[in-house]
UniProtKB/Swiss-Prot annotation:
It catalyses: 5-O-(1-carboxyvinyl)-3-phosphoshikimate = chorismate + phosphate. The keyword Amino-acid biosynthesis applies. Belongs to the chorismate synthase family. PROSITE patterns: CHORISMATE_SYNTHASE_1 (PS00787), CHORISMATE_SYNTHASE_2 (PS00788). The keyword rRNA-binding does not apply. It comes from the Bacteria. Coiled coil: none annotated. Disulfide bonds: none annotated. The gene is aroC. GO terms for cellular component: cytosol. Its cofactor is FMNH2. FMN binds at R123, S124, S125, N235, A236, G275, K290, P291, T292, P293, S294, R316. This is Chorismate synthase. It comes from Helicobacter hepaticus (strain ATCC 51449 / 3B1). This reaction introduces a second double bond into the aromatic ring system.
């Protein structure tokens, strides 16, 4: 499936080494100011080749808006966006044309479709995420109309985990580190993996402030379930946590429950969601990324004829996919919330009366 969302819908298309990547966003209310500079800023944060901690593939990632916007405002019709691929080097993949790269989707795509685009993984490449970030930027514009702010940053690289979360600092950090005190150690881990022709995993934290209570569609489109689906649909994400996450299974109920007083919740172990519905607290979501599977160490594998081969990868690859992946995770959370915001508009009769009985 290449379409995401129920009311705020995004369809993406394109491959890593094709002409480009694009998306169509449907369901956007008319009259939303489309800030192209904000879209550009988010694309720049995800863009490759920014520093030594990301892939050296160079892409301008300039977004061309094809439809759905007139004089800076959404028209209510589908918004089409296109991002050209300008930095492809398909020759880097000639030696693995018939070889399944360990840790990649080569084998599974081949088993499903009987054919695969070996140039950078084709549709399965993380290059596709450029369209998600463009669409996510539009979703964030809608959320900002309601003072909902989505932020992201890196909370851990390898086994080095930050103890404090400073989202303002993450905006300035080369690796989007949330904890200044352990940033240099986290950078060193990435540099060490790169020197060894290896890669390293990491985790991103996404925080949403200003989210009203009531968003989520139980039972089968819960907010936490939708977030899990969105984030687990990203390349390299292997686990998602909300609030205290996995630690919750070690806690007592008296420890985990978020008690309330006249000022609201006194803690936030639930991460802003109860019963699949937002509770008005800050939404806290972690996405855990595996190490980039493209490493320059020879590995054992099979070819399309199921003959044993040695895979020797060439090209330009992220030593830690979590760094740029954090921006994509932020975009996906924004897309989920924009969708939930529109769905919630019909959840009570009084909401409809405000529109139709003025």
């Amino acid at each position: 499936m290449n379409t995401f969302g129920k009311s705020f819908r995004v369809s993406t298309f394109g491959e890593s080494h094709g002409e480009g990547i694009g998306c169509v966003i449907d369901g956007i209310p008319a009259g939303l100011h489309i800030d192209e500079l904000f879209i550009e800023s988010m694309m720049t944060r995800r863009a490759p080749g920014r520093n030594q901690y990301t892939t050296q593939r160079k892409e301008s990632d300039k977004v061309q808006i094809l439809s759905g916007v007139f004089e800076g405002l959404s028209t209510g019709t589908p918004i089409g966006m296109w991002i050209a691929n300008t930095g492809t080097k398909s020759s880097d993949y000639a030696n693995i044309k018939d070889i399944f790269r360990p840790g990649h989707a080569d084998y599974t795509y081949f088993k499903k479709y009987g054919i695969r685009d070996y140039r950078g993984g084709g549709r399965s490449s993380a290059r596709e995420s450029v369209a998600r970030v463009a669409a996510g930027a539009v979703a964030q514009m809608l959320l900002r109309e309601f003072d909902i702010n989505v932020q992201s940053g890196i909370c851990s690289i390898g086994n080095i985990t930050g103890k404090q979360y400073d989202f303002a600092y993450a905006l300035k950090s080369e690796i989007y580190a949330l904890d200044k005190e352990c940033e240099e150690s986290q950078k060193a881990l990435i540099e060490n993996a790169k020197r060894k022709h290896d890669s390293i995993g990491g985790s991103a934290l996404i925080r949403v402030e200003g989210l009203p209570a009531g968003l989520g569609e139980p039972l089968y489109h819960r907010l936490d379930g939708a977030l899990g689906e969105a984030l687990m649909g990203l390349n390299a994400v292997k686990a998602v946590e909300i609030g205290d996450g996995i630690i919750s299974c070690t806690q007592y109920g008296s420890e985990h429950n978020d008690q309330m007083d006249k000022n609201g919740f006194k803690s936030n172990h639930s991460g802003g969601i109860l019963g699949g519905i937002s509770n008005g607290n800050a939404l806290l979501v972690k996405a855990h990324f595996k190490p980039t599977p493209s490493i320059f160490i020879p590995q054992e594998t099979l070819d399309i004829h199921l003959q044993e081969q040695t895979c020797q990868i060439k090209g330009r690859h992220d030593p830690c996919v979590a760094v740029r992946g954090s921006i994509v995770a932020q975009a996906m959370v924004a897309l989920v919330l924009a969708d939930m915001l529109l769905l919630h508009a019909t959840s009570q009769l009084c909401f409809l009366k405000k529109i139709y009985k003025q």
